[in-house]
């Protein structure tokens, strides 16, 4: 199993709207992609910003490519991301899941 980690930040005032937007875009598309085994959306408020981490679980790199395309280490963005995100990584990280009790 592989965990894909994507991160970005919004203004705290946009945090709830961005979360709902994530559910309608990236999270929905993750869940509709064959080989996806779940998604965690994490949020942490720091001063006037909210940091988001999206952790998605996949059965293989090929499954991730089904979502992200052949250049699967690049972050996937949606049309209104620029409206919300004040900081974001252009690349994501992938980790092999060695153990999970969830």
Q: What is each residue range found by the language model?
A:
Residues 23, 31, 65-68, 86:
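Alpha-helix boundary recognition
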Residues 2-9, 40-70:
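Short, well-ordered beta-strand segments in beta-rich or mixed alpha/beta enzyme
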Residues 12-38, 76-81:
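Short amphipathic alpha-helical segments
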